[in-house]
């Protein structure tokens, strides 16, 4: 055997080993960063501080008694920080789900230096209670935030304060009539909650099947349904999820349904700007849920984020996974988004590529469907044979072809 051939083969083996080590090491680093634990001591302190605020009437909400008085909502552990947000896992005994003990998630961006919002400065009487003008000011401020989330049904809401909170404000005032500033406490608590984008979106859109259940609030903290990604949406390196293609196809269909809802189910499109599989989870009803709605933006809000003073290339008009288009003649980002949620989901979740270690959600399809499915996924992720950063939209026709094909695969499996 020629020496040159052996040298080439040895170099190939060494190259493959280096690639393997880099991929494996990168995955370990990614897991370490993503799963870095918050401080247990700090988390317990935050819960103690919250209960202290409840005892002094600075915090209120329907979950405060369960957390602080009856101990029906018990802190279990903390998990990783996401964008400055505290995410704590708790055990909920008969409060979140009547007659059952379930896991729940306690979330808040407070207290965090990055979590800043304008103080709620309302006109008050000398004893701390709101004047009629102060009450009207709060109503108008809260209504403007509510308008950013819903336009079609806002006029049907008779009590904005109670709609945005976990308690009936008037009842809370009656039950705390000896506490003159009870109304102001309610307003401050609501204000601290609705300044958190995730809370506002999920509270307002609880009727959507892909939104985790909102169990309630205490102070600036909100308690939600526990819906972990599981091994299918967040598989471990090498071991994978061990799931069948049929199981993964069902989840893919749920995600496609969410895409359709975000594109067409609201008064204007809602854009996903941080698309990755672990940002979805499986709820108690076995439906796929969106876990991180901080990265969801209504189209009007999205265009404000893309509104640069000027742009010289398309990258200037990007906002994370939401990609814009620069009109070079005017130097302005266009008001029409150049790609949609469907394209991003196909590229970042469904197909195989190096960043997911060639294990997209729809990897290894049944052999009899490969020739039909793989080109369709390619067309979905890279419309019109796009290369690099994709800025072309994926057509609705591709959506329906993919949706119907996955249903057929499940039916015939």
Specify the residue positions occupied by each region the protein language model found.
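Conserved structural core of kinase catalytic domains
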Residues: 132, 137-197, 210-255, 300-302
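Activation segment
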Residues: 229, 283, 287-289, 294-305, ...
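Conserved beta-strand elements of beta-rich interaction domains across eukaryotes
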Residues: 95-97, 109-114, 219-221, 228-231, ...
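Helical subdomain adjoining the active site within ATP-dependent kinase catalytic cores
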Residues: 2-49, 76-79, 317-413
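ATP-binding glycine-rich phosphate-binding loop
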Residues: 23-176, 192-199, 205-209
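Catalytic-loop of the protein kinase fold
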Residues: 259-292, 297
């Amino acid at each position: 055997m020629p020496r040159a051939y052996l040298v080439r083969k040895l170099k190939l083996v060494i190259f493959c080993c280096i690639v393997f080590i880099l991929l494996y090491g990168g995955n370990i680093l990614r897991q370490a960063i993503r799963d870095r634990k918050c401080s247990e001591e700090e988390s317990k302190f935050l819960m103690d501080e919250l209960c202290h605020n409840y005892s002094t009437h600075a915090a209120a909400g329907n979950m405060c008694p369960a957390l602080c008085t009856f101990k029906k909502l018990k802190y279990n552990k903390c998990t990783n920080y996401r964008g400055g947000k505290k995410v704590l896992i708790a055990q909920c005994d008969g409060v979140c789900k009547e007659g059952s003990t379930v896991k729940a998630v306690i979330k808040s961006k407070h207290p965090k230096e990055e979590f800043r919002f304008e103080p709620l400065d309302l006109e008050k009487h000398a004893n701390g209670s709101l004047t009629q003008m102060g009450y009207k000011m709060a109503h108008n401020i809260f209504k403007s935030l509510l308008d950013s989330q819903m336009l079609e049904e806002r006029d049907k809401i008779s009590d904005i304060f109670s709609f945005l909170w976990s308690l009936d404000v008037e009842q809370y005032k009656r039950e705390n009539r000896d506490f003159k500033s009870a109304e102001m406490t309610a307003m401050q608590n609501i204000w601290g909650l609705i300044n958190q984008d995730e809370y506002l979106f999920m509270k307002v859109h609880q009727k959507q099947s892909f939104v985790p259940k909102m169990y309630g609030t205490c102070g600036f903290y909100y308690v939600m349904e526990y819906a972990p990604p599981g091994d299918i949406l967040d598989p471990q390196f090498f071991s994978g999820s061990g799931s069948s293609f049929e199981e993964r196809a069902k989840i893919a269909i749920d995600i496609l349904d969410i895409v359709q809802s975000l594109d067409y189910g609201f008064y204007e499109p809602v854009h996903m700007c941080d698309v990755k599989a672990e940002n979805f989870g499986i709820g108690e009803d076995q439906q796929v849920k969106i876990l991180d709605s901080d990265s969801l933006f209504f189209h009007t809000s999205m265009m404000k984020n893309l509104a640069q003073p000027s742009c010289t290339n398309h990258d200037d008009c990007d906002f994370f996974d939401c990609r814009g288009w620069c009109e070079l003649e005017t130097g302005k980002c266009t008001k029409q988004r150049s790609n949609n949620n469907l394209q991003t989901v196909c590229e970042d979740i469904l197909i195989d590529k190096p960043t997911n270690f060639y294990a997209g959600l729809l990897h290894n399809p049944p052999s009899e469907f490969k020739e039909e499915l793989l080109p369709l996924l390619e067309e979905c992720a890279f419309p019109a044979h796009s290369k690099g950063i994709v800025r072309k939209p994926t057509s609705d026709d591709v959506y329906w072809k993919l949706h119907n094909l996955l249903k057929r695969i499940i039916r015939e499996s």
